[in-house]
């Protein structure tokens, strides 16, 4: 069985954070179709862990119309060349003010592979020291707090934490820390 082949591609929309493109495709059986894809820069997600607690941020997520707890994460479209570890350091410092002595890569995530090309790296940050956050204007409502492992697991199981990347990152942490 072959793969879907891109025959042509056109940009439908672009802004600083994303590109929406529509591709003409040929399926393995030869039939033609279209596929819409959201292209976004690579992101980094950081699991801040002080040995007993996890650092989470809470912010209003406009698309779902609610505040959400999640691990610090983000992209830097103007720094697309940035290595994932550097991006992780930047996001941690920017969103929480935290600095880490060590960043361990736990794995890679595909955000929504049925509609987006975006991929991200998950890093475990340890050796944490406090500092001042440097949040972007869009993050002005963000707050951060520390939670025990039991609290994080309860927040996930009760639906308080619903961010798929955060839940997947916690799963990677659990697999690495058996």
Predicted segments — roles?
Residues 8-45, 50:
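Acidic, metal-coordinating catalytic segment for phosphate/diphosphate chemistry
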């Amino acid at each position: 069985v072959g793969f879907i082949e891109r025959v042509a591609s056109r940009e439908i929309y672009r802004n600083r954070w994303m590109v929406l493109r529509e591709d003409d495709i040929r399926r393995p059986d030869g039939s033609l179709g279209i596929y819409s894809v959201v292209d976004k820069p690579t992101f980094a997600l950081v699991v801040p862990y002080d040995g007993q607690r996890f650092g989470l941020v809470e912010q209003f997520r406009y698309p779902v119309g609610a505040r959400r707890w999640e691990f610090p994460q983000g992209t830097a479209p103007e720094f697309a060349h940035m290595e994932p570890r550097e991006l992780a350091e930047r996001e941690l410092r920017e969103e929480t003010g935290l600095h880490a002595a060590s960043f361990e890569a736990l794995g890679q995530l595909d955000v929504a592979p049925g509609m987006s090309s975006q991929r991200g790296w998950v890093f475990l940050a340890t050796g944490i020291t406090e500092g001042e956050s440097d949040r972007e204007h869009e993050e002005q409502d963000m707050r951060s707090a520390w939670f025990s492992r039991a609290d994080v697991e309860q927040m996930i199981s009760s639906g308080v934490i619903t961010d798929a990347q955060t839940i997947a990152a916690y799963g990677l942490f659990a697999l690495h820390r058996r």
